[in-house]
Amino acid sequence: MALAARLWRLLPFRRGAAPGSRLPAGTSGSRGHCGPCRFRGFEVMGNPGTFKRGLLLSALSYLGFETYQVISQAAVVHATAKVEEILEQADYLYESGETEKLYQLLTQYKESEDAELLWRLARASRDVAQLSRTSEEEKKLLVYEALEYAKRALEKNESSFASHKWYAICLSDVGDYEGIKAKIANAYIIKEHFEKAIELNPKDATSIHLMGIWCYTFAEMPWYQRRIAKMLFATPPSSTYEKALGYFHRAEQVDPNFYSKNLLLLGKTYLKLHNKKLAAFWLMKAKDYPAHTEEDKQIQTEAAQLLTSFSEKN
């Protein structure tokens, strides 16, 4: 109300007006009264109370708008704080390996417009799909659900490296249900998003690792898939084990021992390049990696089997 009081004091027709503020006497009729009176082309209303009330209402309306703005800004701050709190909870559950609890938390906010929340939901959906106890029917639904969340995250923020990364991952997963032709057709799109993720965040070891997987996959592509690729593209996607190895090593340099699968793939790539000594080194690291997730356990098993396999051949 302070603003209203100030406006009231500035009104020209208030009681106790300063000397000289009244209109000159005798401009229209006797005794110095104005009928309404005309003064140099302006008509001044003869009821000052009406004018006061109108101006006061305008002041109050302005104050109401200012209050609305303050409340709106406070709501935005509160909503932002709430999202930050949810993200902290989500990251804690992810680091703790609480896959299903994380999914349950984030699905409550599946209608969110926040890219950071949406890509985490895409990741959580995919992680639940990969659990051994998830049925094939549920897995398929979760894979497509994950792609939708990742797509929305990317639409909300194209500058989010994680949104590019998870969109590419989820698009690749969907290819498992749509056939080899669709998977190859999406190959360049997937590669572009991995490259964009690396460009936006060169220190993200996971994006670099995934680019290595892309190279490894196309390096070992069987002949019949290469034929399909030639039908789809004038220049079909291709790569080499050397390129894959470069990405896996680069990921390891950025964040040593960040992921058991990177260690496994370093070993497998060296096997493809017939370097058994270095293959054994990396496979041993994969086998001894502390198992925090179900995937880690699967990788430990595969690494142990590969070590046994080529040790027996020697």
Curated annotation (Swiss-Prot):
Q: Which keywords fit this entry according to its UniProt record?
A: Cytoplasm, Cytoskeleton, Microtubule, Repeat, TPR repeat
Give the modified residues of type N6-succinyllysine: 165
Superkingdom:
Eukaryota
GO cellular component terms, alphabetically, are: cytoplasm; mitochondrion; mitotic spindle pole; spindle microtubule
- One Pfam family assigned to this protein is RMD1-3
Q: Where in the cell is it found?
A: Cytoplasm; Cytoplasm, Cytoskeleton, Spindle; Cytoplasm, Cytoskeleton, Spindle pole
Which residues lie in coiled coils? none
Record has Protease as a keyword: no
* Gene Ontology annotations of biological process type: attachment of mitotic spindle microtubules to kinetochore; mitotic spindle organization
Q: Answer whether the UniProt record assigns the keyword Repeat to this protein.
A: yes
Where, in residue numbers, are the TPR repeats?
168-204, 222-258
The GO terms this record gives for MF are: microtubule binding
Similarity field = Belongs to the RMDN family.
> What is its quaternary makeup?
Interacts with microtubules.
What protein am I looking at?
Answer: Regulator of microtubule dynamics protein 1
From the UniProt record, report the name of the gene that encodes this protein.
RMDN1
